[in-house]
Amino acid sequence: MIWLDITDPKYVLFFKGMLPLLKKIDEVIITTRGNEDYSETHRLLELFKIEAYCIGGYGGASKLGKLQARLQRQNGFLSLFERLGKTPQIFITGASVEGVQTAYGLGIPVINFADTPIAGHIFSLQALTILSRLTLPLSSLVFHPFVVPAQCYEALGVAKENIIAYEFIDVALWLRDLKKGKDFREELGLDSSLPCILIREEEYKAHYVKEKLPIIYESVHLLSSSLNANLVIMPRYGSEGLIKEFGGLNNVHILEKKLDPSEFYPYIDLLIGGGGTMNLESCYLGIPTISTRSLFLYHDIYLLENRLMHHAKTPQEVLFFARNILSKLTPPVPNAHLFEKEKAGFEKIVETLKQRFFTPN
């Protein structure tokens, strides 16, 4: 039995293409987490009709809350395996401390997909994230995208032969063949003749983000009063606070449901992103992108060096870039060649797993 713990939305999209290959090897079970303020991952699994056991929830921003949630989930995993009457042969994850520690404690090999080992873009031991410190040393095998140096993983004691780079950036897996889906603007009742700006909050509760900055929210107010455009906010943790702050603005709309990428990317003219994954997605698709995030990771530097993205430090800079972009819109041209040194896929990765963990000695 192969066990995956999928704990954030990015890894739903990431592992979706891997599941059919894994199911050819052995039975696969998937666990996830979800609660009222953090249901995006669970809803995305449901959207793609991926069956999963929902074990525990998200602990929030506090250290105590995170620890309590992890302990509850670990007990939940043990109860699940007891109900199933069997223990997994391998464990696969992208960002699950409790999954890694449960698997390690049970003697289950840990396969880790890790793309954010440090909180920054220049290596130092001090920059290693809490997530990395709690998971990578317990990993039997670590896979990472080519833009992140192997040094980040070696520093935590992972042997060189157990660190494997793949020659693509994750978002290429699910965006390469993106087709136009149902136009989300119709459901929101937006005027399709106006430019459409999608806005994504920073992952301010994440382990590698030090504080919640106001720039993205101040930018919404400034853009709303300065541009004749549709502003659509995609919440990260919950919509209640956003509705309270922006609900009275006629040209600001807040998404309440989870959408497939095919339903919104083909219909937006600009992405303003405080996070990482959606900035990468829009840059891959050739959509103009403004980053407001509070720190640079290796991926951000790669996008900036290749002139795929702007970075703004103030709402005024956001407005400047937005006006300039909207004044000379052209059809987006995908940048696949910068994201795929070789065709994105899981075939080589799954073959490695078969050889290492499922081939009789």
Label every PLM stretch briefly.
Residues 72-81, 238-278:
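Donor nucleotide-activated moiety binding/catalytic core segment of transferases
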Residues 90-102, 112, 263-301:
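A donor-sugar binding/catalytic signature common to diverse glycosyltransferases
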Residues 139-212:
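A nucleotide-sugar donor-handling region in carbohydrate enzymes
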Residues 48-51, 55-60, 65, 199, ...:
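Catalytic donor nucleotide-activated moiety binding site of glycosyltransferases and closely related
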Residues 329-361:
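C-terminal amphipathic helix plus adjacent low-complexity
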Residues 6, 26-69:
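Conserved nucleotide-sugar phosphate-binding/catalytic loop shared by glycosyltransferases and other
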Residues 112, 119-143, 265:
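A conserved, positively charged/aromatic
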Residues 284-330:
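Catalytic binding pocket for nucleotide-activated donors in carbohydrate/polymer assembly enzymes
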